[in-house]
Curated annotation (Swiss-Prot):
Other comment: Appears to be the first example of a new class of functional RNAs also able to encode a protein. Rat SRAP1 may act as a protein rather than an RNA transcript.
Gene Ontology molecular functions: steroid receptor RNA activator RNA binding; transcription coactivator activity
Tissue: Expressed in various prostate cancer cell lines.
Comp. bias (Pro residues): 55-76
Official protein name in the record: Steroid receptor RNA activator 1
Family in the record: Belongs to the SRA1 family.
Functional summary from the UniProt entry: Functional RNA which acts as a transcriptional coactivator that selectively enhances steroid receptor-mediated transactivation ligand-independently through a mechanism involving the modulating N-terminal domain (AF-1) of steroid receptors. Also mediates transcriptional coactivation of steroid receptors ligand-dependently through the steroid-binding domain (AF-2). Enhances cellular proliferation and differentiation and promotes apoptosis in vivo. May play a role in tumorigenesis.
Subunit composition and interactions: SRA1 RNA exists in a ribonucleoprotein complex containing NCOA1. The RNA also forms a complex with PUS1 and RARG in the nucleus. Interacts with AR.
């Protein structure tokens, strides 16, 4: 290939003159032409504009919307309206004054023949109880405990009735102090009367059970 780049020597020159190189052949046989760096790239044939290349940060993917936002509200959780639901009726029996005073007055009549003066004071105390009950000055707990006290009194449970009396004096002394003294005295008088009646019954039954010595009742 060297002979392609060397021109034949000039016949007029000497034998030792250097050969002349042919630069035209080098450009003809050289590699492929390089595209000049200043040449612009042709626009695409379809006519669509090219998106400008930006060097900003990549777009951030937003999370999908929460499914709670589109979920319908559960049944029964409707927004509260201005109308309040009707309140449930209170199932509670009212303690009647007759259920308390009538047994107390009956117990008072049973004791009146024994201690009249004491029973007169008890009667005045029971009148105060009646007045405060009708006047709405007694609370519901006091009324309920008095109903229990009367039931224990009717069943001759003296100790239990006395315990209820003491609890009322401790917990509600302001309400019951004016008339509870009479109730306490009535419990004591009723207990004493019951004890005397029991003794009389025992003394009456004893002679009937006695037998005459040496006498056998006929069968």
């Amino acid at each position: 290939m060297a002979e392609l780049y060397v021109k034949p020597g000039n016949k007029e020159r000497g034998w030792n003159d250097p050969p002349q190189f042919s630069y035209g052949l080098q450009t003809q046989t050289g590699g492929t032409k390089r595209t000049p760096l200043t040449k612009r790239v042709a626009a695409p044939q379809d006519g669509s504009p090219r998106a400008p290349e930006t060097s900003g940060p990549p777009p951030v993917d937003h999370p999908p919307p929460s499914s709670k936002a589109s979920r319908p509200p559960p049944m029964g959780s409707c927004p509260a309206s201005g109308v309040d639901p009707p309140s449930s009726p209170v199932i509670e029996s009212e303690t009647l004054i007759e259920d308390v005073l009538r047994p107390l007055e009956q117990a008072l009549e049973d004791c009146r023949g024994h201690t009249k003066q004491v029973c007169d004071d008890i009667s005045r105390r029971l009148a105060l109880l009646h007045e405060q009950w009708d006047g709405g000055k007694l609370s519901v707990p006091v009324k309920k405990r008095m109903a229990l006290l009367v039931q224990e009194l009717l069943h001759h449970q003296w100790d239990t009735a006395d315990d209820i009396h003491r609890s009322l004096m401790v917990d509600h002394v302001t309400e019951v102090s004016q008339w509870m003294v009479g109730v306490k005295r009535l419990i004591a008088e009723k207990r004493s009367l019951s004890s005397e009646e029991n003794k009389e019954e025992k003394s009456t039954v004893a002679p009937e059970n006695q037998t005459i010595p040496g006498f056998q009742p006929s069968s």
